[in-house]
Structure formats: structure tokens, C-alpha cells
């Protein structure tokens, strides 16, 4: 975790060509679990790291843009994202997925993105009686986000 935080906050200060290296976005699904906010740091022209917090969980991820991130263009990406969530009186779980999507970065520093991809989710259910069950399944997961670059 320390290495991730070091890369997220200090590595980008070495001078990459991006003028606006930070993104705050509102998300549905994705690294912020159900609904939440995420902070994304662009660490190079092709890589960004993300931390998210939502109503029921937290998450993190890395996004790789095969082609350079450019303003006023559709930028395709993939990566790896993980989120963990807790539902009071029900249980919790984790979701790991590989997104395939696209983001549009406007000249006014707004961005919008959408992705879908294969996911592996684990849910641990519990009840007041002490009984627990664990379910792991493979499914499709995604993310819709609207954010601001600064």
C-alpha cells in the first residue's frame, strides 16, 4: 500500500507532459463500489492510478491508455480495478475486474467515461444467528463516471 501511495503522489512530480494531472469524478459502480467519488492521478501520458470511496465501500485501480491521453478526443483504455464493500447486517465482499472502455476529455477540463469488463466477485453473507456463507462468481461489471480535470 505504501508503494501505491508513493507512486500515486510523488512519482508524477518528476515532470510529465500532462497539464491537468488530477481528476475528481462521480462514479456509478467502478472502484468506488455502488455510487461514490474517485480521485485519479495521471502519472504519465498512458497511465493513471485511482482511489475511490463510495456509499458502501472503497476501491483502487490502475488504468492504461494504449494511446496517449489527449484533450478533445475519445481515449480508449484498459486496466485493473478492485473494490471492497460492506453491507450492514448482510455481509461484504470484493470485486476485481478488468475494464475495457473509453473516456472523453473536453477542452473545458470535463471528462466522461464508460467501461465494462469481466469481473470476479466474492460475497460473504452473515446473519445475526451466526451463520455465514461465501459465494464467488464470475460476471460482467462496469463503471460510468463524470469528472473534472485539474
Enumerate the language-model features and the residues they cover:
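Sec-dependent N-terminal signal peptides
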Residues: 3-14
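Flexible, solvent-exposed loop segments that connect beta-strands
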Residues: 19-21, 47, 84-92, 120-138, ...
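Transmembrane beta-strand segments that form the barrel wall of outer-membrane beta-barrel proteins
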Residues: 20-56, 73-86, 112-119
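Membrane-embedded beta-strand positions in outer-membrane beta-barrel channels/transporters
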Residues: 36, 59-61, 97-99, 143-145
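Residue-level signature of outer-membrane beta-barrel architecture
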Residues: 41, 53, 64-66, 102-104, ...
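Outer-membrane beta-barrel channels and translocator barrels
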Residues: 44-46, 67-71, 105-109
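Mid-chain, structured segments of secreted extracytoplasmic proteins
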Residues: 60-96
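Outer-membrane beta-barrel "beta-signal"
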Residues: 62, 136-150
